Amino acid sequence: MTAILERRESTSLWGRFCNWITSTENRLYIGWFGVLMIPTLLTATSVFIIAFIAAPPVDIDGIREPVSGSLLYGNNIISGAIIPTSAAIGLHFYPIWEAASVDEWLYNGGPYELIVLHFLLGVACYMGREWELSFRLGMRPWIAVAYSAPVAAATAVFLIYPIGQGSFSDGMPLGISGTFNFMIVFQAEHNILMHPFHMLGVAGVFGGSLFSAMHGSLVTSSLIRETTENESANEGYRFGQEEETYNIVAAHGYFGRLIFQYASFNNSRSLHFFLAAWPVVGIWFTALGISTMAFNLNGFNFNQSVVDSQGRVINTWADIINRANLGMEVMHERNAHNFPLDLASVEAPSTNG
């Protein structure tokens, strides 16, 4: 008689938890990065919603002039924002327990720091989770690399720029009009439109939109016909089919004749690498530009570059931009300082007879 003994697998609770976290069979993959991503993004989202609706005014400039940002304090969806942490706090870590009371924490803009730091940690973990899922499925890692562009951009405006300027009050407000205000002030103080890295970012975003539209329309227009001419070509396609849907040779021929031969890709991998790399590299450069301007390495200054034989300035477009910058600079934080830095840095004339 033969006795077969089956050894029972005794999986601990921790082991089952690990298997569940790293399982690719779940409807939504969690992963170890997800263990940190889920609570941080939930915290950032929850506090953002509550603060956007009900946060009291914040003393953003540290001069006892609170600015209202929430819906219950008179704003709408367009004008509302999470007001950045007060200049009185600077770059100090300012959790709730560091304040004397919750009222003080709210008055000094504590929710902004809480939201931003949790959000940045969350999106960084989302990027790591993309890599983790790719790794478990045996895929290449480029999805996470592409996502690093918006992560870098968010890190630049929410963390690097405040560090360079010395205060979280200089970070980008979390709202529509607050974003526009940040952009206008950034142009006034750093002349970002004249920074080559910003120009590369504009080329990346607009070029990426153009290439995406061109690619999508070209593929949709060169479907492989599986039907008669009496019914739609779309009827010949079934979602998830293994066969190729469109004819890249036909698309290449069309585009090559529309512009010229070498403007068209005949290799699908090269084409899709280009479509991914163009906007990603552009946004990388923009994030790098914000990070350098954070430490006041600003855009090009061509003010008063052209003069006539008598030394009189002939205004160029750079001088028009400079005048606009000065106008924007004197208008923002109008109660925090009497003159923009450009004017205040000039030595005052002596008044002692």
From Swiss-Prot:
Annotated site residue numbers, Stabilizes free radical intermediate: 190
Post-translational modification: Tyr-161 forms a radical intermediate that is referred to as redox-active TyrZ, YZ or Y-Z. C-terminally processed by CTPA; processing is essential to allow assembly of the oxygen-evolving complex and thus photosynthetic growth.
TM spans (from-to): 29-46, 118-133, 142-156, 197-218, 274-288
Amino-acid positions noted as binding pheophytin a in the UniProt annotation, renumbered to this chain: 126
Molecular function as annotated in GO: chlorophyll binding; electron transporter, transferring electrons within the cyclic electron transport pathway of photosynthesis activity; iron ion binding; oxidoreductase activity, acting on diphenols and related substances as donors, oxygen as acceptor; oxygen evolving activity
Any one GO CC term of the record: chloroplast thylakoid membrane
Binding positions ([CaMn4O5] cluster): 170, 189, 332-333, 342, 344
Residues excised as propeptide: 345-353
Binding annotation for chlorophyll a ChlzD1: 118
Quaternary state and interactors: PSII is composed of 1 copy each of membrane proteins PsbA, PsbB, PsbC, PsbD, PsbE, PsbF, PsbH, PsbI, PsbJ, PsbK, PsbL, PsbM, PsbT, PsbX, PsbY, PsbZ, Psb30/Ycf12, at least 3 peripheral proteins of the oxygen-evolving complex and a large number of cofactors. It forms dimeric complexes.
Protein name: Photosystem II protein D1
